[in-house]
């Protein structure tokens, strides 16, 4: 499995970074398609460092920029083999099927059995502009698909059948997570946010 360059952030650096608020369901930023990154700036590098710190603090294994209010096509991850960052990611191929229980930091405390391809080929670039090409299966493949969903404004609820979605909405309503959150700026939004469906 190839690893992205500069996606490995030393623990000493991560300790100095800050956590960022994770947006939750009901926030329009989660339903907005993220725009391509055209230039890797110092601010973008700092964002990814803060995203990694936030992800570890949550705790989670992946975090997409829209989950912290930034509408750019970038995500961070660490499924146990060290942190990574992928800019402008896309899946170029997939194979097989795998049902697995999946949760989301933007829908805290809830999980569902979700069917996804078992294997994917993820491509993109790292923070140095080097090509990233990762053949992943099972958990890493699921992680990459989940984060790409966030970059496209797709949530786990969109993978549920109608009855599951109704039950999920009832549960979310009971947990008071489905209420719209206070409006916060959407950084780099490419189009107006669509309402949560």
Predicted regions and their residues:
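Positively charged
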Residues: 2-197
């Amino acid at each position: 499995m190839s690893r992205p360059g500069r996606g490995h952030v030393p623990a000493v650096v991560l300790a100095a970074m800050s956590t960022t608020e994770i947006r939750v369901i009901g926030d329009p930023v989660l339903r907005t398609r993220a725009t391509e990154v055209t230039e890797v700036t110092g601010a973008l590098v700092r964002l990814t460092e803060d995203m990694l710190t936030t992800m570890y603090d949550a705790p989670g294994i992946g975090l997409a920029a829209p989950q912290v209010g930034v509408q750019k096509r970038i995500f961070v991850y660490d499924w146990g083999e060290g942190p990574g960052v992928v800019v402008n990611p896309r899946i170029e191929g997939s194979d097989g099927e795998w049902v697995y229980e999946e949760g989301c930091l933007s829908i805290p405390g809830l999980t569902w059995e979700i069917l996804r391809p078992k294997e994917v080929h993820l491509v993109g670039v790292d923070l140095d502009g080097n090509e990233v090409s990762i053949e992943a299966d099972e958990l890493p493949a699921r992680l990459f698909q989940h984060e790409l969903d966030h970059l496209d404004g797709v949530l786990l609820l969109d993978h549920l059948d109608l009855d599951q979605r109704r039950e999920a909405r009832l549960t979310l309503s009971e947990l008071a997570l489905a209420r719209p959150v206070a409006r916060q700026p959407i950084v780099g939004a490419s189009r107006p946010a669509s309402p949560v469906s």
